[in-house]
Regions:
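A composition-driven signal for long, intrinsically disordered, charge-rich low-complexity tracts
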Residues: 5-11, 263, 284
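A structural signal for multi-pass alpha-helical bundles of membrane permease subunits
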Residues: 23-315
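Short, Lys/Arg-rich, polar N-terminal cytosolic tail immediately upstream
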Residues: 6-26
């Protein structure tokens, strides 16, 4: 015993020092330990496939033969294949049709539901449900029933003297079916628009009303400018989603007829899991990724011309 302390207490041989160090380490790194499972999952299911697909895109890789480096040959095949280019054109057409139509419809419904009307909570839920069920098999069956030759849509049209139309058998008709399906799933942007509308101060509407502005003038001069950040957010997220659309064409039309509804995501699926051409599928996916990133960059660049952000004082 030296200086009132035993040899064990001074040297920490009893393990107390190690315990203190462990507790201190745990206290400082508890956050890292908590997110470690997420990082492991991210690395396995996101990061590894992301990097692997980039490598595969430069290889002639089929599940049934050894991968060989092929450079840019997959990308050259994509640019030279009219069927693949048709899928890209159809995807552009699909995205730039559905995004504005869906957002306009979502904003219109959100504007109506923003008023104090009876049963508003029921309607909010009812309008949101399709966005949850849009990719289910039951919705595919329902949509086929609605648009088949003897379906409900043609039955209603016949009441007005319109001849039945083979929606799912006609290339143009089938394309509009999947467009209508996606517009019908406007629930997610509607909820976001509704939250933005509730954030607009009533004082601004009162001031505009005093200046003689009617409802329409208030909507376009007060409401729209103040919710442009939300419009921008919905536009970017929906544009990215539409370029990656898979469920609608897959479960309703299977890409037909005559490949009229074969979008790029479905093309990636067909190459990867039907033809087992993983190299080609990866190249198509990466080309789609570059297109989405480019369009997103253009959207972010354009926001300074039309998106209104209030300053720190809320002005």
């Amino acid at each position: 015993k030296v200086g009132g302390k035993t040899w064990y207490s001074r040297t920490g041989k009893h393990g107390g020092g190690d315990k203190m160090k462990f507790k201190e380490f745990r206290k400082k790194n508890v956050g890292l330990l908590l997110i470690l499972p997420w990082w492991i999952g991210f690395a396995i299911f996101k990061l590894y496939p992301f990097i692997s697909s980039l490598i595969y895109s430069f290889h002639d890789y089929n599940l049934f033969r050894t991968a060989t480096f092929s450079g840019l040959s997959n990308y050259k095949k994509i640019l030279g294949d009219p069927l693949i280019m048709k899928a890209f054109i159809q995807t552009f057409k699909y995205a730039f049709l559905t995004v504005p139509l869906e957002l306009i419809f979502a904003l219109f419904i959100a504007y109506i539901l923003n008023f104090k009307i009876k049963g508003v909570n029921f309607f909010r839920t009812a309008y949101y449900i399709p966005s949850i069920l849009g990719g289910s098999v039951s919705i595919a069956v329902l949509w086929r029933f609605l648009f088949k030759t003897e379906g409900l849509v043609n039955m209603i049209a016949s009441r007005f003297g319109i001849q039945p139309f083979n929606w799912l058998g006609d290339p143009g008709g089938a394309f509009w079916v999947i467009v209508f399906l996606k517009i019908w799933q406007f629930g997610s942007p509607m909820v976001i628009f509704l939250a933005a509308l509730k954030g607009v101060s009533k004082d601004l509407y009162e001031a505009a009303s005093i200046d003689g502005a009617g409802k329409w003038r208030q909507f376009f001069s007060v409401t729209i400018p103040l919710i442009t950040p939300v419009i921008f957010y919905n536009f970017v997220t929906q544009l990215c989603n539409k370029f990656q659309e898979f469920n609608g064409p897959f479960i309703v039309t299977q890409g037909g007829p005559l490949r009229s509804t074969t979008l790029v995501s479905l093309l990636v699926y067909n190459n990867a899991f039907k033809s087992y051409e993983m190299g080609m599928a990866s190249a198509i996916a990466w080309l789609l990724f570059l297109i989405i990133m480019t369009l997103t960059g253009v959207a972010f660049f354009s926001q300074k011309y039309w998106v209104y952000y209030s300053d720190e004082d809320g002005r």
